[in-house]
């Protein structure tokens, strides 16, 4: 190939697009408004759009296949308007939002795909420039025609030296080409920033969760006061608890009616505290206006159904990981074996396991109170008359519980 023409100064006869402004050290997506203004002020960079099957368009066809809906492939026997639209979209290829669809590569005049190494180029020239710098190939390039080749999309692969010189001439920056280590570091930084944005977005979404309304705050206040007034020893249970002697309840010694064995001494201690514990649960329920509005028959059914559950919850939230004990009724600290041999059997394992799980949540009095109210208002108890009403009450406590958790997390 021979050079087609020369300029007056003896430079190659390619069009000379102006390089990017000196004040812009690197093209970035965040500054595209200024970049677009600069680009539009240089009409000599524009040219007619020519549809050719470039590697970019070929890649876009492959990408489009993976985005077809079921309707797109349901009938392949006859063409449709949607099929023509899909085919037309394939031919256009990917165009960044900041780039005009008819923007041309400043090196070869092919269809540009974006800003690469500080210039508007196609994928081919971007890859050529990157490989040349990364592998230090330019010293080995040589031109057969004294460095005067015209570089366009047809001839660009025929002379590497002239193509590289034009890349430099139009302003492509060698310092922006990263080696393997820098490229891996950049990729790692991108992943870290993406993860950071994901966490921030998650925190923002959590921050928008609703908190209690004024009406719910009134309900929360009533339930919390009812719990505090009927919870033995309150928040001072650790200071006031007494440990059951170690020699009590270590081994079952008497056969129980169900076929198991019970330590009578431990059983005697437990029966002494069970009656006041039940009384406190009843008092808690009576302090809730919603409960008092229910028929007496429903009140009895609800209390029979939830009494053991609420007492177990109150014991579970007083689990001490250090001593591995539960404090019953706010006064008696017992081990798992003592509770099991004292008559509770396998139920003791469930209560201890619940206590171990709840200990990591650090529940406050309000959360425990609302959980008790939810257990109390269980509409699935057999024999209830006001099922829908009780279910509505439970939903109110559940919603208040959720909103209070949001409030506590954000405060």
Curated annotation (Swiss-Prot):
Record's keyword annotation contains Nucleus: yes
Region (Interaction with NR2F6): 242-411
Annotated region (Disordered), positions in chain: 1-24
Zinc finger map (NR C4-type): 105-125, 143-167
Binding residues for 3,3',5-triiodo-L-thyronine: 280, 329
Source domain of life: Eukaryota
Cellular component annotations (GO), alphabetically ordered: RNA polymerase II transcription regulator complex
Pfam families, sorted: Hormone_recep, zf-C4
Region of interest (Modulating), residue spans: 1-104
Keywords: DNA-binding, Metal-binding, Nucleus, Receptor, Transcription, Transcription regulation, Zinc, Zinc-finger
Subcellular location: Nucleus
Matching Gene3D superfamilies: Erythroid Transcription Factor GATA-1, subunit A, Retinoid X Receptor
Start-end of Basic and acidic residues biased regions: 15-24
Annotated family: Belongs to the nuclear hormone receptor family. NR1 subfamily.
Task performed by this protein: Nuclear hormone receptor that can act as a repressor or activator of transcription. High affinity receptor for thyroid hormones, including triiodothyronine and thyroxine.
UniProt xrefs under PANTHER family: NUCLEAR HORMONE RECEPTOR, THYROID HORMONE RECEPTOR BETA
Annotated protein name in UniProt: Thyroid hormone receptor beta
Protein source organism: Ovis aries
Gene this chain is encoded by: THRB
């Amino acid at each position: 190939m021979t050079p087609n023409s020369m300029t007056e100064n003896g430079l190659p006869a390619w069009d000379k697009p102006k390089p990017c402004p000196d004040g812009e050290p690197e093209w970035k997506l965040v500054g595209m408004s200024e970049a677009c203004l600069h680009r539009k002020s240089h009409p000599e960079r524009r040219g007619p759009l020519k549809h050719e099957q470039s590697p970019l368009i070929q890649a876009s066809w492959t990408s489009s296949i993976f985005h077809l809906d079921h309707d797109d492939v349901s009938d392949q026997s006859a063409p449709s308007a949607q099929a023509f639209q899909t085919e037309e979209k394939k031919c256009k290829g990917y165009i960044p939002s900041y780039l005009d669809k008819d923007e041309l590569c400043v090196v070869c005049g092919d269809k540009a795909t974006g800003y690469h190494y500080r210039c508007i180029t196609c994928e081919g020239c971007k890859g050529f420039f990157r490989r040349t710098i990364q592998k230090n190939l330019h010293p080995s390039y040589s031109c057969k025609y004294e460095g005067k080749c015209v570089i366009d999309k047809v001839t660009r692969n025929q002379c590497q030296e002239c193509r590289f010189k034009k890349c430099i001439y139009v302003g492509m920056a060698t310092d922006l080409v990263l080696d393997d280590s820098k490229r891996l570091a950049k990729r790692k930084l991108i992943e870290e920033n993406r993860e950071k944005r994901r966490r921030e977005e998650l925190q923002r979404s959590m921050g928008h969760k609703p908190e209690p309304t004024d009406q719910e705050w009134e309900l929360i206040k009533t339930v919390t006061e009812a719990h505090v007034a009927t919870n033995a020893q309150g928040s001072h249970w650790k200071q006031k608890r007494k440990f059951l002697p170690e020699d009590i309840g270590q081994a079952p010694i008497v056969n129980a009616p169900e076929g198991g064995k019970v330590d009578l001494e431990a059983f005697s201690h437990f029966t002494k505290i069970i009656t006041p514990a039940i009384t406190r649960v009843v008092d808690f329920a009576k302090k809730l206006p919603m409960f008092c509005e229910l028929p007496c028959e429903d009140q009895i059914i609800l209390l029979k159904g939830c009494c053991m559950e609420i007492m177990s919850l109150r014991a579970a939230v007083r689990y001490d990981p250090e001593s591995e004990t539960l404090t019953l009724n706010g006064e008696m600290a017992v081990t798992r074996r003592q509770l099991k041999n004292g008559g509770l059997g396998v139920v003791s394992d469930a209560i201890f396991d619940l206590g171990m799980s709840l200990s990591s949540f650090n529940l406050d009095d309000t959360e425990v109170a609302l959980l008790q109210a939810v257990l109390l208002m269980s509409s699935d108890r057999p024999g209830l008359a006001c099922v829908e009403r009780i279910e509505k009450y439970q939903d109110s406590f559940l919603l208040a519980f959720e909103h209070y958790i949001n409030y506590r997390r954000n405060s």
